[in-house]
Each structure stands twice: as structure tokens, then as C-alpha cells.
Regions:
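Structural marker of alpha-solenoid helical repeat scaffolds
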Residues: 24, 58, 92, 126-128, ...
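Register position in tetratricopeptide repeats
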Residues: 41-42, 75-76, 109-110, 145, ...
Length: 251
């Protein structure tokens, strides 16, 4: 009898564990996951975490739950926990491009440029990744931060080729402008800064870079217009303050 009880007790954890994979458990996990995602979209990251942690109890092996846990932790400023969750998501789904991309962004935040680039490359290795322009843009910025301008330009140009109408288009052209500016190719820098501000006039950092580049070629009239745009869209920011200083220096 005692042997039977011991056998049953040893088997119970297996039974209980397997029960968490039932359709009912998956349905419950989806309910909490859906609530968590909605709360993330509303910017309520703490409440989102509560829902997602409940979802994890019902389906701990769902990579999507860990992915959104990572996003919620980012929203709360808990970077290390976010890294752990994205790694869990990837361990459960190796070709999870979105998780690789987010992990790369976190590595960039830590200035781990090579690690970030490796994650973006893994994201891009997935042929059915829906938004490759995001990882290409991020990869370009990581290369730029390393002062590897050749690869930075290649990645940004690929982003434009893959998705010319991307929501990131103004940012991509701004970054290409910065690459050319650092290489003293002022005409190309101005061209790309102009594209960026034409697509998004409120992109005030690009407006400032444009104005400063115009100053380098002594085009004070266009520089003045660019600085005035910075002040219009972001008067109290560091960019706005710098634009005011430039305007005061222009005679």
C-alpha cells in the first residue's frame, strides 16, 4: 500500500504539469495575454505585467507571453528582466524575429553594439519577418555608433529598399544624413536631411542637423529656416535651445 501511495505521489507532478497544456489552460492564457497586450498599448505597464504573469501560469511555454512580458518590463524601466524574458521567448521560438529585434535594442541601450548587431542579424535571417526595416534601421544605428559608416550606410539603404514607404523613412534618411555629415559629404547630408524634414517637418533633431550643415557651407538663409522650424516644434528642448543660440549668432 505504501509503495502504491509513493508511486501515485511521484506521478502526480507529471499529471499536473501535463494538465497545464490542455486547451482550457491555453484559452485562459489567451484571455490574460489579450488583456496584457491591451494594457501595454494603453501604457499601463504595471497592470499589464499582472495580466501577463497570470497568462504565464497557464501557459509558461508560450513564447508570445514572454515576448510581451519583456515589453512590459521595458515600459517599467526594468531592463535586465526584459532581457531575460526576450531570451526566454527566443529559447522557445528560435526564429522569433520581433524578440531578437527587441533584445538587440536593449543591447544598444547598454552600448553592446556587436551583441546588438548579432540579434538584428538573427531577426533578419527569418524570411517571413514582417517588419525587416525595423531591424535594418536598428542595425544601421548600431554600426553608426561603432563608426562603421560603410555598414551603417548599407543597412539603412537596405531598409529603404525593403520598405520605401516605412513609417521609419524620415528617421532612416536622417541617419543617412548623419553618416554623410560625419564623412564631410555635406551635399549628401543636406539632401537626406531635407528628405527627412519634408516627410516629417516636426522631426526637430533633423531640422537642427540640417541647419548646422547649412551653416558649414555658409548658407545662412536656409540655416535660419531650419533653426526656426526647430523652435516651432520643440522650443523648450535641448535642440530648441541650441537652435536659438544659432539664430542669435547669425548676422
Amino acid at each position: 500500500m505504501n509503495k502504491l501511495i509513493i508511486t501515485v505521489l511521484l506521478c502526480c507532478p507529471i499529471i499536473f504539469f501535463s494538465c497545464t497544456n490542455t486547451p482550457w489552460h491555453k484559452e485562459q492564457a489567451e484571455v490574460f495575454l489579450s488583456k496584457g497586450v491591451s494594457l501595454i498599448e494603453a501604457g499601463q505597464f504595471n497592470n499589464a505585467l499582472k495580466e501577463l504573469m497570470e497568462a504565464e501560469k497557464y501557459s509558461s511555454g508560450d513564447p508570445k507571453i514572454h515576448y510581451y512580458l519583456g515589453i512590459a518590463y521595458i515600459g517599467k524601466g526594468l531592463r535586465d528582466k526584459a532581457v531575460d524574458e526576450f531570451k526566454k521567448a527566443i529559447s522557445l521560438k528560435e526564429n522569433y524575429s520581433e524578440a531578437h529585434n527587441y533584445l538587440g535594442v536593449l543591447y544598444m541601450d547598454m552600448e553592446l553594439w556587436d551583441e546588438a548587431i548579432a540579434e538584428f542579424d538573427k531577426a533578419l535571417a527569418n524570411d517571413i519577418y514582417d517588419t525587416p526595416s525595423f531591424s535594418l534601421y536598428n542595425s544601421g544605428w548600431a554600426y553608426y555608433s561603432k563608426k562603421d559608416y560603410q555598414h551603417a550606410l548599407i543597412q539603412n539603404q537596405k531598409a529603404l529598399q525593403r520598405d520605401p514607404g516605412a513609417i521609419l523613412r524620415p528617421q532612416i534618411d536622417k541617419n543617412i544624413g548623419l553618416i554623410y555629415l560625419d564623412q564631410a559629404n555635406l551635399s549628401e547630408a543636406i539632401r537626406h536631411f531635407n528628405i527627412a524634414v519634408e516627410l516629417s517637418p516636426s522631426l526637430y533633431d533633423a531640422q537642427l542637423f540640417l541647419g548646422e550643415t547649412y551653416l558649414k557651407i555658409q548658407d545662412k538663409a536656409n540655416a535660419k529656416k531650419a533653426f526656426q522650424a526647430v523652435i516651432k516644434y520643440s522650443p523648450q528642448s535641448a535642440y530648441g535651445i541650441k537652435a536659438k543660440e544659432h539664430l542669435q549668432s547669425i548676422k
